[in-house]
Amino acid sequence: MLEEMQQMKTIPVLTNSRPEFKQIPKKLSRHLANLGGPHVDSFDEMLTVGLDNSAKHMIPNHWLSPAGEKISMKVESIWIAKPKVPQDVIDVRTREIYPTDSRQLHVSYSGMCSVRLGWSVNGVQKTPINMDLGEVPIMLRSKACNLGQATPEEMVKHGEHDSEWGGIFVIRGNEKIVRMLIMTRRNHPICVKRSSWKDRGQNFSDLGMLVQTVREDESSLSNVVHYLNNGTAKFMFSHVKRLSYVPVCLILKCLMDYTDEEIYNRLVQGYESDQYYVSCVQAMLREVQNENVYTHAQCKSFIGNLFRARFPEVPEWQPDDDVTDFILRERVMIHLDTYEDKFQLIVFMIQKLFQCAQGKYKVENVDSAMMQEVLLPGHLYQKYLSERVESWVSQVRRCLQKKLTSPDALVTSAVMTQCMRQAGGVGRAIESFLATGNIASRTGLGLMQNSGLVIMAENINRMRYMSHFRAIHRGSYFTTMRTTEARQLLPDAWGFICPVHTPDGTPCGLLNHLTLTCEISMRPDPKLVKAIPKHLIDMGMMPLSNRRYLGEKLYVVFLDGKHLGHIHQSEAEKIVDELRYGKIFGTLPQMMEIGFIPFKKNGQFPGLYIATGPARMMRPVWNLKWKRVEYIGTLEQLYMEIAIDAKEMYPDFTTHLELAKTHFMSNLANLIPMPDYNQSPRNMYQCQMGKQTMGTPCLNWPKQAANKLYRLQTPGTPLFRPVHYDNIQLDDFAMGTNAIVAVISYTGYDMEDAMIINKAAYERGFAYGSIYKTKFLTLDKKSSYFARHPHMPELIKHLDTDGLPHPGSKLSYGSPLYCYFDGEVATYKVVKMDEKEDCIVESIRQLGSFDLSPKKMVAITLRVPRPATIGDKFASRAGQKGICSQKYPAEDLPFTESGLIPDIVFNPHGFPSRMTIAMMIETMAGKGAAIHGNVYDATPFRFSEENTAIDYFGKMLEAGGYNYYGTERLYSGVDGREMTADIFFGVVHYQRLRHMVFDKWQVRSTGAVEARTHQPIKGRKRGGGVRFGEMERDALISHGAAFLLQDRLFHNSDKTHTLVCHKCGSILAPLQRIVKRNETGGLSSQPDTCRLCGDNSSVSMIEIPFSFKYLVTELSSVNINARFKLNEI
C-alpha cells in the first residue's frame, strides 16, 4: 500500500508534455482499480467460495411419493462458466464472447449456470445429475469474464479502454451496476430503541438487542431479544417474512441440556450484585415452568409441536424435536455452528440488554457508521441466485409429484432428468433482476427494499461514471421517512464517507460516496482467522470453558459474533497492541478490525469486538509505533487517537497519523480546485455539476452502441488542478474549456448569474458539443432484407443500394432513414426520420447474432451537432453556474492593452454572497499558468495563513509582468476609451453542462387534453402544455396582471359551459332533457329544467373550469352537495 502511494504524483504536470502520454500502461492504476474493487472482488468471491457455501447450506427437499418412497433432493454444487458462443452455432472465428460484442449486438453478457443435483430414495444415494439452468449475466473483469486477467494492452485489443476497471453488467446492450447499500453490521449484538417494537405484542417495550446474523453463504436473518415492560424478555426469529416470539429462556433450554440452576448461574455470572437483573432472570425461568415444560427434551417437543405447521421443510415422518432443531439451526444465530456458541451469545445479549435497560450503558444507533456495513453486488447476486436455485428444486419436486401419481410409479434417473429439464431455469430471473433492479423474493433476502437495487451506469462523462462505483445508498425506505436521523453525517463516518459528495434534494444524506482510500473488506484466509483464538489465549484471555468466578471488571471478547471469553482490564491495552502488531505484519488478517471499547460511565457497553468478515468499511492510517500502514474499521476508529497533521501529535498519546489530509474526501471532491477556500454548499454543487458536464465519455467511439452519448469536441486540460486529477488520468477523458474571463458588469445581459460569451470564440468552436444517438434496425422475418426501392429514383441521393444512408450524410425530419424489402407482403417500405433536429450519419454497422435463426440487424449512429446556444448552462468548478444569455460580438467587448478579448464576461455580483474564493484564486493561477506555460497545484490544504495562496499566485503574476492582484485596465469595446476601474481578468476552467435549451424548449397552441380534467396533457414529447406553477401564479398576482392569470389558467386551460340553477345553486341538478326526434331527424328538447326545484325559469349557462365541475361531481358521490351563490350583473 505504502509503495503504491509513493508512486502516485504529488504535484500535477502537463499531460501531453510527458513522453509516456501515448503509451498504453503496463498495468491498471491503483486508484482506478479501487473504483471497481468492491464490485469485482465480491463477485470473484462468489465464484470461488460463495457458490460452494450456498450449495452446502441449502435445505434438502424431502417428500413421500405415492409408492411410499422417501425422496430427498439437495444441490451439491453450483458453477458459472465464461461467456461462449453456443456449440450449435458454426462459422465463428473464436468461441469467446467479449463485452464489446454484447454491447454492439444489444444482448446480455452471460455465461452458463449449471448445478449438480444429488438425490436419494429411502436413504440410498443415487448418481448425481448435472443440469444447465440457463445463462446468467457476468460481471466485467471478474474471474468468469473473458477479460478477467487481461492487461491494458489486451483490453484495447478487444475494444475496451486500457483503464477499464470492470464492476458492471452488460444487460441487453446497456451497462448496469448493482448499488452498494448500507446494512446493519453483521453478527454484532446491538442495543437498539425502536418505537415500532411496542406494537409487537403485550408488554413489549421499544428496547431490544438486535443481531443481523449472516452465515458464510451470505444468508441473512434478524434475531432480536425484546425487553418486556414486566421485566422478562422474548426472542424473535423470522421465517418467510413471518415473525415469531418465544420466551428467551425457553430457547436457552432448547439449545443446551442444562438445569435451571445452571442457566441461572450463567445468566447472572458477573452481575450477582444487580438485584433487579437477578429477580428478572428468576421471573423468566418461572415463565418457562408455567408452560409445564421442565426438561430439555420437553422444551424441544413443545416448540416443535407449536411450530410444525410453519415449517414444511421438515418432513412429516420426522418427530417434533427435529422441527426445533431446524429452527435452532436455520433460524437462530445462523452464523454460529454449535448450540453452545448460540447459547453463550444469547446469554450475553440478555446481560447487555438488561444493563442498557437500567441506563447503565448507552443505547446504540444503527444510523451510525460504526454499526454499519455494505451490501456488496457479489453478495446480493449470490443470495438471489441461491434462492432461485432453491425455487428450481421445488419446481422439480412439483414436476415429479405430477408424474408420480399412481402407487406403482417409481423414481428413476430418466424421470428425474426429464423433470429437471421441465422445471425451467434461473437465467431469465437473474437477467430480469439486473435489467429492472427489482427482486421477486419469497424470503426478502434480509433486505428492506425489493426495487431500485440496480441502476444504469450512465456514462455522461468520466466523473459521472466513476461516481457510480463509489456510491453507497442508505436504502429507498429512508427516502419516505420524515425524520432526518438517517441523513445526518455523524462524526464516526470520518474517513469512510465523504462529507462533500452528496446530492441536494430528496437523496441528500442518503446517497453518499466512499472516501478516496476507503476499502471494503473481503473474506480473509480461513487459516489466519482460526489462529486468532489461540493468539488471544496465549496473550491472557480466559476462555468461556474456564468456569471460575468472573469479576465485573472484565472485558468480553468477541470474534465475528462468537463469544470467546474474557480479558482483565489491566491487560486489555497490551493485548490490543499485540493484535495490531499481528495485523500489520501478516500473522493475522490484514483487514481485521479490533474494536476495543473501554470502560466508561454511562458509555458504550465495553468489550473487545474483533471482526474479520467481509463487507466492512476499512481505511489505511499510519501506525506511529510500528512505522507501517494499518487498516482500521468504523468501530475501532472511535476509540483511537489519530492525528490529521504531524504538528498535532501528542507524545505517548497519539497512536496513528492520517496518510494525507485529503483522504477524507471522495474521488470527485478531490477534483475540486481548492475546496478549502469555498463555502461548503458550493463544493457540494460542484460534485453534482461535474457529473452533468459534457466531456469525453469514452475513447472507443467506433465500437460504441449507447443510446445517447454527450461529447465536447474541443476539451482542454485545466491549468489549475489538484494532483488527484493526474493520478486518476482524467486528461484521457477531458471535460471543460479554459476560458479567458473578465469579471465586469458590462451589459444588462449578465444579471442573475447569466454570462456573456464572445461570439468570435463561439465561431471558433468554443464549448462546441455533439450528441451521439444509436438506432437499432431489426428485420425479424427471414425473407426480408435491406435494399433501396428500385422504382423510386428520388431515394438515390439519400440512400445507398443497400437501403441504408451514406455515412456522413445529413438527415432532417421526414427524410428517408432506410428502406427494406418486406418479404411477407413482397413490397419495399421506406422508413422516415423521426428526429426533430438535423443530424449527421456518423457510422453504420451490420450486426451478427448468436441465434440459430439470425435476424438482420443494423446499428446506425447519428451525430447531432450542439454548438453553444443562448440558454445553455455553464458552470465553473467552484459551483458558479449560469446560463449563456447573449453571444456578444468581439468588437463590442472590452479588450486589454495587449489586445486580449475575454471569452466570458462574468458578473462580479456572483462572488460576494457565494464566497467562492477558490474561483478568484483560480482566475489568478490560471493566468499565471498561461503566462509561464505551467500547471499549478490546486490540492487543498497546501497553503496556510502564513503562506497564503493569493500571495503565492500574486507574485507569480508579478514575475510575468502583470498586476499582483490579477486586475487589468480594459478599454471599452464601444468607444475605445480606457475604463476607470481595475478589472479582474484571468483564465478559468469552465464546464459546459448537458442541460441545453434544445432539449428543454416547449411551445403549444392547441393540442390534446386530459380526458378526466379537460386540461392540457403534460409532457414535452407528447405536445403537452407549458408548465404554469405556483411561482408563476404568484408572479402574476404580485404584478397585478389579473387578466393574464385568467387567460392562462382558465381560457387557455379547461374552460367549459355548464347549466346552473339560480334558486338552489346546483350545477348537477339542471337537465337539458331530450324528448324526441323531429321530422328532419334532429332532436328537440324541452327548456332546461332543474330537477331539484322543478323550475325552468331560473336555469342559465355559466363558464367554469372543468376541473371544478369534476370536483363537484366527485363530492356528490360522497353525499356532499356544493351550492353556488350567484349575483346578477
UniProtKB/Swiss-Prot annotation:
Keyword NAD: no
Top-level division of the source organism's lineage: Eukaryota
Disruption of the gene: reported phenotype: RNAi-mediated knockdown results in decreased cell size likely as a result of its role in the synthesis of ribosomal RNA precursors.
Reactions accelerated catalytically: RNA(n) + a ribonucleoside 5'-triphosphate = RNA(n+1) + diphosphate
Zinc finger intervals, C4-type: 1061-1093
One of the Pfam families matching this protein, by short name: RNA_pol_Rpb2_6
Protein EC: 2.7.7.6
GO BP term, pick one: transcription by RNA polymerase I
Compartment(s): Nucleus, Nucleolus
GO cellular component assignments: mitochondrion; RNA polymerase I complex
GO molecular function, one term: DNA binding
Main location: nucleus
InterPro entries tied to this protein: DNA-dir_RNA_pol_su2 (IPR015712), DNA-dir_RNAP_su2_dom (IPR007120), DNA-dir_RNAP_su2_hyb_sf (IPR037033), RNA_pol_bsu_CS (IPR007121), RNA_pol_bsu_protrusion (IPR007644), RNA_pol_Rpb2_2 (IPR007642), RNA_pol_Rpb2_2_sf (IPR037034), RNA_pol_Rpb2_3 (IPR007645)
Keywords: DNA-directed RNA polymerase, Metal-binding, Nucleotidyltransferase, Nucleus, Transcription, Transferase, Zinc, Zinc-finger
Subunit composition and interactions: Component of the RNA polymerase I (Pol I) complex consisting of at least 13 subunits.
Family membership noted in the UniProt record: Belongs to the RNA polymerase beta chain family.
Role, per record: DNA-dependent RNA polymerase catalyzes the transcription of DNA into RNA using the four ribonucleoside triphosphates as substrates. Second largest core component of RNA polymerase I which synthesizes ribosomal RNA precursors. Proposed to contribute to the polymerase catalytic activity and forms the polymerase active center together with the largest subunit. Pol I is composed of mobile elements and RPA2 is part of the core element with the central large cleft and probably a clamp element that moves to open and close the cleft.
Name under which the protein is recorded: DNA-directed RNA polymerase I subunit RPA2
Gene of this entry: Polr1B
